[in-house]
């Protein structure tokens, strides 16, 4: 699609979102567009420090969990001594960027709002690790904590997955993997999904939205996909194109959140409509005036905090619902 035909989203953003877009961190160099992937990862970590400041204080513990691919680092956030459930969090970053530190504030707020232990999983990044390694690492982490719950003072009778962007895909894919492979790590009561991609190759929103402001042009999305997948055939895998999986049965309750001007919004809409059509429990909420990745900006955007609290409320409601 000719770029000039796209919707001029920057003129339609909320005032809060505009403030974030126009915010300049003092001393922050420009994005290293020509840098190698490691340079870009270090920049992303540096740029996110401001947005992760002033987060709630709580007990944390780092644990290296053995998986078939080697140890994976996890971080446990415990807002209180006892917990009614355990929530596993998968960070976004296009499969190639991000770690536990870039999403620290998000996980702390989720732990605070749910009152539950949140476990962040520092899965291996692409292109060094290809599909389905991150999913298999996530499943291995869940299995480990299910078997060692007492050692970490965890309640794994009820568990959930949560994630943003690529992490949302990994969260839902991991849940479907557990179901399809008949692996039990606890009663999976809910999945919290913020502006994920779920397998569409093209859509109206991908044509109308996306640009330098969000790093989600068609070329960007192709780059993330090529870094993550092993080959073209993986595009149709039911744990990558999740619409090729069976979404008509036994899908845990899903909270599906989207950003109004996100090129990936149609992925969320289609997921919601598919689950709804087959009576799978779900809730969809679109946050007006926002761009992809707005969840990071709760220091300046009340709507980002609202989106986290909405997901937390959904999770807490499922904790009280027999399943």
From Swiss-Prot:
The keyword Cytoplasm applies. SUPFAM superfamilies: alpha/beta-Hydrolases (SSF53474). Keywords: Cytoplasm, Hydrolase, Serine esterase. The keyword Cell cycle does not apply. HAMAP family: Acetyl_esterase. Homodimer. Interacts with MalT and MelA. This is Acetyl esterase. It comes from Salmonella choleraesuis (strain SC-B67).
């Amino acid at each position: 699609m000719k770029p000039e035909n796209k919707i001029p989203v920057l003129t339609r953003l909320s005032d809060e979102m505009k403030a974030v877009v126009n915010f300049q961190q003092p001393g922050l160099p420009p994005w290293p567009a020509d840098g190698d992937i490691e340079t870009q990862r270090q920049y992303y970590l540096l740029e996110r420090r401001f947005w992760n400041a002033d987060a709630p204080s709580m007990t944390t513990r780092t644990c290296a969990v053995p998986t078939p691919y080697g140890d994976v680092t996890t971080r446990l956030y415990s807002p209180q001594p006892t917990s009614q459930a355990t929530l596993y969090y998968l960070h976004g970053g296009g499969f190639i960027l991000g770690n536990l530190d870039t999403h620290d504030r998000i996980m702390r707020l989720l732990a605070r709002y749910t009152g539950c232990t949140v476990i962040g999983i520092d899965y291996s990044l692409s292109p060094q690790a290809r599909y389905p390694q991150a999913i298999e690492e996530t499943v291995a982490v869940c299995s480990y904590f299910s078997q060692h719950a007492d050692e970490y003072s965890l309640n794994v009778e009820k568990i959930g997955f949560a994630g943003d962007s690529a992490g949302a895909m990994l969260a839902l894919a991991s849940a479907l993997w557990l179901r399809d492979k008949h692996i039990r790590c606890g009663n999976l009561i809910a999945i919290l999904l913020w502006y994920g991609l779920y397998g569409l190759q093209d859509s109206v929103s991908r044509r109308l939205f996306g640009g330098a402001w969000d790093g989600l042009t068609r070329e960007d999305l192709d780059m993330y996909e090529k870094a993550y997948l092993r080959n073209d055939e993986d595009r149709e895998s039911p744990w990558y194109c999740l619409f090729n999986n069976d979404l008509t049965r036994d899908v845990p309750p899903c909270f599906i959140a989207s950003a109004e001007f996100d090129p990936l919004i149609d992925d969320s809409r289609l997921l919601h409509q598919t689950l709804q059509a087959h009576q799978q429990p779900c809730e969809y909420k679109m946050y007006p005036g926002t761009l992809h990745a707005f969840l990071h900006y709760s220091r300046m955007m009340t709507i980002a905090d609202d989106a986290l609290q909405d997901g937390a409320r959904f999770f807490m409601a499922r904790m009280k619902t027999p399943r």
